[in-house]
Design a protein with these regions (language model features):
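NAD(P)+-binding Rossmann beta1-loop-alpha1 motif at the extreme N-terminus of oxidoreductases
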Residues: 1-60, 64
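Structural/interface elements that position substrates and couple domains in central-metabolism enzymes
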Residues: 38, 199, 203-209
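Helix N-cap / loop-to-helix initiation motif
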Residues: 43, 68, 169, 219-223
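Rossmann-like NAD(P)-binding element
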Residues: 42-49, 60-122, 130
Length: 344
């Protein structure tokens, strides 16, 4: 099976299972980059909503100059929908599962996909951090099962995590990495099947400390978010935390770590503040209240501003990565990481 390259774009059949926010974004990105895609959901109304969301997203991309109207029309022609799982996967080469984050549900679905999809088809999951090995074990083709985790909004955020389960075929990993690159993404290979993979482990480490600081009265939610977007988050868009430490000086970071590490705690369960918010039904944007209050109008406005920001950031990142270095020997933007083993 070949998922990449010019010719397979007219032959390879992609299926996205699940028409929620992530499924719609993934299907849109595939179709708008020349892939034939079937989006499947048992809820016909969800498919209608997904089509509407994709149309809105394409219009926004066109307005931002990231996509032409012709590309949108061609992408729309390559995207079909169905409520029949059997019909969707009958001739599939790659099935991307994007259903709710429940391991038992996903295992049942993967077992059904294993029964219905052609023997050569790869089955991959958009899970945010559930076990790829367990998903593979629910099929008779564990070597053809991998993680393929996109970030929301899928059509804008560059990161895609390609995750190896214990039995995942390395060739499938290479094909998924190449596919994601051809789709304009910034893929990474998660070599071990650990809960949360890489992105969410980093995100939740920060989230845990953010909750602690707010719960202890150190800072307000608003100032906490400003600290991140105006400080580490601002530079992390270009330099990751390890290279940022290189720039800051590892001696400086070691000095700070020597007194700060012991104060960061070792909690093994969600903080009480988060428990109390969940019990109160305070779930964030979906309930109209989280650390901030949201009305439908304010949420719509905020979402539009977020997407415009991400579009502008994507344009800047794409330009910066494609721009030639100022000198032939300037390797700052693409410095090769030094892989060091921990001291014995």
């Amino acid at each position: 099976m070949n998922l990449t390259g010019q010719e397979p774009r007219t032959q390879t059949r992609f299926v996205v299972l699940g028409a929620g926010t992530m499924g719609a974004g993934i299907a849109q990105c595939l179709a708008d980059h020349g892939r034939w895609v079937t989006m499947c959901d048992t809820d016909a109304e969800a498919l209608v909503r997904a089509r509407e969301r994709i149309a809105t997203s394409r219009q926004t991309l066109e307005t931002a100059g990231l996509q032409t109207a012709e590309q949108s029309r061609e992408g729309d022609q390559r995207l079909s929908t169905t409520t029949s799982l059997a019909d969707a996967v009958a001739a599939a080469d790659l099935v991307i599962e994007a259903i709710p984050e429940n391991l038992e549900l996903k295992c049942r679905v993967f077992a059904e996909l294993d029964r219905l999809a052609p023997a050569h088809a790869a089955l991959v999951s958009n899970t945010s951090g559930l076990s790829i090995t367990r998903l593979g074990q629910s099929t008779n083709r564990p070597g053809q099962v991998a993680g393929f985790h996109w970030w929301n909004p899928a059509e804008l955020v560059p990161l895609v995590e390609v995750v190896s389960g214990e039995s995942t075929d390395p060739q499938l990993v290479e094909q998924l990495l190449e596919l994601a690159t051809e789709l304009g993404k910034q893929p990474i290979h998660v070599r071990r099947d650990v809960p949360g993979f890489v992105g969410n482990r980093l995100q939740f480490a920060v989230f845990r400390e953010a909750l602690h600081l707010v719960a202890e009265g150190v800072v307000t939610p608003e100032d906490l978010d400003r600290a991140m977007t105006g400080g580490p988050g601002f530079r992390w868009s270009f330099l990751g935390p390890l290279q940022a430490a290189d720039f800051g000086g590892l001696d400086v970071f070691h000095s700070i770590a020597s007194y700060l590490w012991q104060d960061l705690g070792d909690a093994d369960s969600p903080p009480p503040l988060l428990d109390s918010m969940l019990q109160a039904g305070t779930l964030g944007t979906k309930s109209g209240k989280g650390f901030y209050d949201y009305t439908p109008e304010s949420l719509n406005n905020l979402t539009e501003r977020r997407d415009r920001f991400l579009q502008g950031l994507k344009q800047l990142v794409d330009f910066t990565r494609s721009a030639p270095a100022s000198t032939a020997d300037d390797d700052t933007a693409t410095a090769k990481p030094q892989h060091r083993q921990p001291a014995a």
